[in-house]
């Protein structure tokens, strides 16, 4: 017998009749509602970025169970603030400061545009949720809120044990409280006494702020006086801070670091943590041969893979390079596809055809020439004739949608062919990236066929690029064997003996601590939404909790000040230097991975 393990997300989703919609579908529906409510005709690819921002705001409102009508009240409408009895004095003061900034007579154009847009947000929020509900779907926050407020849910298990939480959103607090009242909820908190506030709530470190706040409401099932659990940060540790001139230099240093102190031998007790996950690729190329067992939980960017390059070449070929009226294609785009390394999985003749075209300087080769007069099935699939492109347009009332569906279907066919013909290739990155690319394009095809994705081809191409660039590929390794390579979020609730943090700069750790939101800070603060302060406290906890049981710690940061970089170590590194009594070694990484020891400033 063993207990059932689920994430908090699965717990919410399992008790809702709604399904959480995928991000592309959610943005497409939001785009339609936005256009209806505002009358602003914005192309989907231009809308996509701030559609994500708007969706994140709606998600935050629901996860923190705020009243959307009060959050989005009219800035010029002061009587909307008449009833503020539910707000604290501090919250009322925050609101007053914000609304006062809109009462002067020096309106700027930006301010007028913001007020105009803001006045529609409440309508967009309600209309959007209604549209999604009619389809039986919702964004994550809406689903969570529905579950948190539903008093009739039958929780089937006798016990729910919540392990390793830090900051709780209002929906989580509500769910915990519901289960606690049913005597079904038990809580295990993971922290260290070193960063917890004292009885008077005094501590310059915000890492333990939220756990200290929740422990009275949700008591710890573990004995808080056990030093083996809650008093580890002060224990003996070897700690080194290393400054580096570049990110690539840090990646190359990984091999040297792994080669000492039995770090490779200790396998799963060794972790390389990426505060900036963009350096994953150079790290993978720098791993020593002895490190034959590695588990990678950090996602690899789909846009940096060969299959993404092939998809780009295919898009260019089938749009800019397509001479469907002449039943031919432009050699410039044909060559890039035929010479791509994955072209051989479509047809073994690709290289031969490319050489022949170059030799005879056929700048607009016909379908017959490209397909060996129709005798090569792979090439026939790769270079469809003009009938393929024109038939769908003639059969459909909406030629734009039909053309997009045809284009997306063709991309799916080619990518699927590559995957099927290369199924015996052992390269995990190849297999994962090909599958991920297929799922992205196939999802767009589904949305196009059902009419949810109604855009022109130019917009579609830009949208595909945005989606591919933002998509990541999950690596499937063995979590209990080998060296662990992961991002900061993947380290939650895990302990390691040997720890190497890379790119631990201010801006990476804490990560993304900015108010990327339509909702100004003052209003977010007043209505209990997520703010910069919350994000800093969350990352402070991640950082200090990761160090607390480790004994061999190396933290690297980039000291370069070019290309907009500040060259600053993370604020958490500085705070740890001040708060702890450890003799931290300070070193600099020089050329050829040589190390120079220096005294701290």
Where do the language-model regions lie?
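Accessory/regulatory regions of helicases
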Residues: 331-336, 505-601
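Nucleic acid-machinery interaction/catalytic patches
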Residues: 1-522, 581-594
């Amino acid at each position: 017998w063993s207990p059932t393990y689920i994430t908090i997300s699965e717990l919410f989703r399992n008790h809702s009749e709604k399904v959480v919609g995928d991000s592309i579908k959610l943005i497409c529906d939001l785009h339609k509602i936005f256009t209806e409510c505002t009358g602003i005709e914005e192309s989907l690819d231009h809308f996509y970025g701030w559609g994500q921002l708007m969706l994140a705001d709606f998600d935050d409102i629901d996860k923190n169970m705020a009243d959307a009508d009060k959050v989005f009240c009219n800035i010029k409408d002061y009587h909307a603030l008449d009833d503020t009895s539910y707000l604290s004095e501090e919250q009322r003061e925050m609101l007053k400061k914000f609304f006062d900034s809109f009462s002067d007579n020096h309106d700027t154009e930006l301010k007028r545009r913001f007020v105009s847009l803001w006045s529609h947000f409440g309508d967009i929020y309600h209309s959007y949720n209604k549209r999604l509900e009619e389809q039986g779907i919702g964004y994550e926050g809406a689903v969570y809120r529905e579950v948190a407020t539903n008093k009739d849910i039958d929780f089937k298990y006798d016990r729910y044990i919540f392990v390793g939480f830090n900051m709780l959103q209002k929906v989580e607090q509500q769910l915990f409280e519901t289960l606690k009242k049913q005597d079904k909820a038990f809580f295990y908190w993971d922290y260290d006494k070193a960063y917890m506030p004292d009885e008077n709530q005094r501590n310059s470190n915000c890492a333990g702020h939220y756990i200290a706040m929740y422990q009275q409401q949700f008591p710890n099932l573990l004995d808080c006086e056990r030093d083996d659990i809650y008093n580890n940060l002060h224990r003996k540790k070897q700690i080194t801070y290393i400054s580096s001139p570049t990110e690539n230099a840090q990646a190359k240093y990984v091999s040297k670091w792994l080669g000492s102190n039995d770090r490779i031998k200790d396998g799963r007790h060794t972790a390389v943590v990426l505060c900036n996950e963009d350096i994953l690729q150079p790290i993978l190329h720098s791993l020593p041969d002895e490190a034959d067992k590695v588990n990678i939980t950090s996602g690899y960017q789909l846009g940096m893979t060969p299959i993404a390059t092939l998809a780009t070449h295919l898009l260019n070929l089938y749009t800019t390079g397509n001479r469907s009226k002449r039943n031919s294609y432009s050699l410039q785009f044909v060559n890039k596809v035929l010479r791509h390394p994955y072209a051989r999985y479509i047809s073994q003749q690709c290289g031969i055809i490319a050489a022949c075209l170059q030799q005879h300087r056929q700048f607009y080769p016909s379908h017959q020439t490209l397909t060996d007069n129709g005798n090569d099935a792979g090439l026939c699939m790769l270079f469809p004739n003009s009938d393929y492109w024109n038939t769908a347009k003639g059969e459909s009332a909406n030629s734009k949608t039909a053309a997009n569906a045809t284009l997306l279907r063709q991309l799916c066919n080619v990518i699927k062919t590559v995957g099927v013909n290369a199924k015996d290739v052992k390269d995990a990155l190849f297999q994962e990236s090909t599958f991920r690319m297929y799922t992205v394009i196939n999802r767009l095809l589904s949305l196009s066929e059902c009419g949810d994705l109604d855009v022109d081809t130019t917009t579609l191409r830009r949208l595909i690029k945005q989606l591919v660039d933002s998509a990541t590929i999950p690596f499937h390794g063995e979590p209990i064997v080998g060296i662990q390579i992961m991002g900061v979020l993947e380290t939650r609730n895990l302990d390691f003996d040997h720890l190497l943090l890379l790119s631990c700069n201010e801006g990476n750790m804490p990560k993304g601590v900015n108010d990327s939101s339509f909702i100004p800070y003052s209003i977010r603060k007043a209505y209990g939404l997520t703010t910069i302060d919350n994000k800093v406290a969350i990352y402070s906890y991640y950082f200090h909790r990761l160090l607390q049981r480790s004994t061999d710690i190396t933290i690297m940061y980039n000291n370069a000040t070019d290309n907009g970089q500040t060259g600053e170590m993370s604020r958490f590194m500085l705070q740890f230097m001040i708060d702890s009594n450890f003799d931290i070694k300070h070193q600099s990484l020089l050329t050829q991975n040589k190390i120079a020891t220096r005294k701290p400033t």
